[in-house]
Amino acid sequence: MEIGSAGPIGAQPLFIVPRRPGYGTMGKPIKLLANCFQVEIPKIDVYLYEVDIKPDKCPRRVNREVVDSMVQHFKVTIFGDRRPVYDGKRSLYTANPLPVATTGVDLDVTLPGEGGKDRPFKVSVKFVSRVSWHLLHEALAGGTLPEPLELDKPVSTNPVHAVDVVLRHLPSMKYTPVGRSFFSAPEGYDHPLGGGREVWFGFHQSVRPAMWKMMLNIDVSATAFYKAQPVIQFMCEVLDIHNIDEQPRPLTDSHRVKFTKEIKGLKVEVTHCGTMRRKYRVCNVTRRPASHQTFPLQLENGQTVERTVAQYFREKYTLQLKYPHLPCLQVGQEQKHTYLPLEVCNIVAGQRCIKKLTDNQTSTMIKATARSAPDRQEEISRLVRSANYETDPFVQEFQFKVRDEMAHVTGRVLPAPMLQYGGRNRTVATPSHGVWDMRGKQFHTGVEIKMWAIACFATQRQCREEILKGFTDQLRKISKDAGMPIQGQPCFCKYAQGADSVEPMFRHLKNTYSGLQLIIVILPGKTPVYAEVKRVGDTLLGMATQCVQVKNVIKTSPQTLSNLCLKINVKLGGINNILVPHQRPSVFQQPVIFLGADVTHPPAGDGKKPSIAAVVGSMDAHPSRYCATVRVQRPRQEIIQDLASMVRELLIQFYKSTRFKPTRIIFYRDGVSEGQFRQVLYYELLAIREACISLEKDYQPGITYIVVQKRHHTRLFCADRTERVGRSGNIPAGTTVDTDITHPYEFDFYLCSHAGIQGTSRPSHYHVLWDDNFFTADELQLLTYQLCHTYVRCTRSVSIPAPAYYAHLVAFRARYHLVDKEHDSAEGSHVSGQSNGRDPQALAKAVQIHQDTLRTMYFA
């Protein structure tokens, strides 16, 4: 298999993704149910038309209303009793051809507008091609799909897209679509999140090609929406004001900034014009209150006068403002100076919250949405019954049948690897249900800590000296048991305050105590000190730091202290445990490097922050030690721009550490969605090859490129209740599926490698996009599962392989390195993310790790 000629990125060559090399056989069989429902599709052709609506750039909801109105209006002349389905953009499908000329037809459609005015639209409908579901049947039987599901093409001849549109047409008219999910306003339940937001429940629905058949993936889903309420109340929620009437003064600057950040970009409707509820988008909040905010008003005689907003509302609407001391919303285009007093505006219903939730909101959300596996299974079954596909007129029009029972699948529970510890007795731990115990065991290679310091950023009142003493004694006891002895008392133990004292203190420590190995930093809750400690320690001075929350110092538990030791040992160059060598797959017989890669994007609404790409690589044969590389790149760019130089660095580092050149590169890539598979693979595979060739022109190690996906909606349930594990009744750790619900012929599998503690476990989905090493299904599944046991932060198997997890941690840590002390306060009170005033060079320098830290696992 060879990639076509290396053309420009735009023109992608034909790319042969490897076919499945066979099925896995290892492990104990387990009967499962998957939330996939078989869709029977007739072997017919359907007709695709391109729809062009002018004015364009309307939201899909409006487009749907236009097309719906068009079908009703031109029923007699064009549509007859056909029921077309429409994707909200440019594709319209019919089961029978329409009587329109090959040149297409232009139609006029009007929708009732706001305030009694009609909105005119021009719609052109033009035949594009027939779409064959015969071909789809052949592909599902193991042929090849006509083309990958390119979801970004404007008019898609892809038969899978046609199936998807048929099944989404009715719900798109009935509910509020968000991505591939549908939501409706809460009725009979109320889940406020605070800050003017609330939880809406709904369902996810997507069509997936599976073996021999099409499957409909259905899952329960929840997301945050803004509560429809008066803007005054919204402001009170955002600013924690309990009673607006007790706020007789104008907003403070910091309050106004916080309120602006939340309401900017939202739609509001006005209440002072009777039934004419005009809607506007908020672009800003005025600095001045309504009583002082002026604008130029043109009088009937043509002269222009300055009026305050409060005056204008009194004169024009005989409305005496109740809160003239509050600011106004500036709406529409900034240059137009349209101001509305807060008290005449409501937040428009049905607006999804794309801004990042606060920590409290996130935890409320999880509590409201976490369901044990059996509950979720029941809820999904209920959803499918209530969706009632057999009565959906559009599903009937295209002769579909949707089964209403979940797909039965046979999975396998893979054996867990044994883990080798150190100490005199070199004990072995065998995980049970994804968990093992370190009690009575010592690290494989423990570090001796001779020189260490404590910096306490909690106040002396919060954390008295005897509490600190008790904590250090406990920590030393646990660390000695774990085989990582901390010798004697700290060489330095002082209280400090505020982020500004971090750098001078650390510089003093570095200059005074040569051979200082570790600084333990005690933090008083969520604080900007953390970001500063990591910036100074990781990037500026190259010092190992371990932060601990003060609550865990006051109330120590062996579990917390033991977890602390897991992190400290690794940061200082130790090895906690290794996979017992003789049970590892044969890929370990020659030098192999495991790479993990991830790109994290700034939260929505933060246009100015860069995306961060991280790649980590294993540095030994176990594999247990990793080295990290990190770069900033253009916001929202998924391809790792600088991958060639990052991989090159890691290969050099591997050679320095092991004196071997890897003969194989196993690359786990997180965070790529299916629509991007081909372009990301094309660019990144060539980049990895380029890195190899830049070291030696004949150096061509075999590359295996695997995408790891966690953000999908496939869930697996035990068919037999007795197999359920734990309080939430999940599938056992190690459950693997590579038949029935997987791709008809590509090499993919689901593996749930962790024990679900809360809610329903989400199996990770692995898709092999390139494989020079010709892995069998068993080898790759087992290797992947074993790597999930090598994550150093806990004694549990985690949900994705350690290298992919570490890449995520590295990128996440780099976000902290980018926090700009001058602008970013930890609460994020500043509008949008900073790091905007800094040029790309400054950003690149900010995430650069100090030479002394570079070779350590500082991110652990």
From Swiss-Prot:
GO terms for biological process: miRNA-mediated gene silencing by inhibition of translation; mRNA catabolic process; positive regulation of gene expression; positive regulation of non-canonical NF-kappaB signal transduction; pre-miRNA processing; regulation of stem cell proliferation; RISC complex assembly. Residues 230-349 form the PAZ domain. The keyword Phosphoprotein applies. One of its GO terms (cellular component) is cytosol. InterPro entries: AGO3, ArgoL1, ArgoL2, Argonaute_Mid_dom, Argonaute_N, PAZ_dom, PAZ_dom_sf, Piwi. One of its GO terms (molecular function) is miRNA binding. The modification N-acetylmethionine is found at residue 1. Ubiquitinated on surface-exposed lysines by a SCF-like E3 ubiquitin-protein ligase complex containing ZSWIM8 during target-directed microRNA degradation (TDMD), a process that mediates degradation of microRNAs (miRNAs). Ubiquitination by the SCF-like E3 ubiquitin-protein ligase complex containing ZSWIM8 leads to its subsequent degradation, thereby exposing miRNAs for degradation. ZSWIM8 recognizes and binds AGO3 when it is engaged with a TDMD target. It is an enzyme of class 3 (hydrolase). Its EC number is 3.1.26.n2. A divalent metal cation binds at residues 598, 638, 670, 808. It catalyses: Endonucleolytic cleavage to 5'-phosphomonoester. Keywords: Acetylation, Cytoplasm, Endonuclease, Hydrolase, Metal-binding, Nuclease, Phosphoprotein, Ribonucleoprotein, RNA-binding, RNA-mediated gene silencing, Translation regulation, Ubl conjugation. Residues 530-567, 758-805 are annotated as: Interaction with guide RNA. It is found in: Cytoplasm, P-body. Interacts with EIF4B, IMP8, PRMT5 and TNRC6B. Interacts with APOBEC3F, APOBEC3G and APOBEC3H. Interacts with EDC4. Required for RNA-mediated gene silencing (RNAi). Binds to short RNAs such as microRNAs (miRNAs) and represses the translation of mRNAs which are complementary to them. Proposed to be involved in stabilization of small RNA derivates (siRNA) derived from processed RNA polymerase III-transcribed Alu repeats containing a DR2 retinoic acid response element (RARE) in stem cells and in the subsequent siRNA-dependent degradation of a subset of RNA polymerase II-transcribed coding mRNAs by recruiting a mRNA decapping complex involving EDC4. HAMAP family: AGO3. Belongs to the argonaute family. Ago subfamily. This is Protein argonaute-3. It comes from Mus musculus. The gene is Ago3.
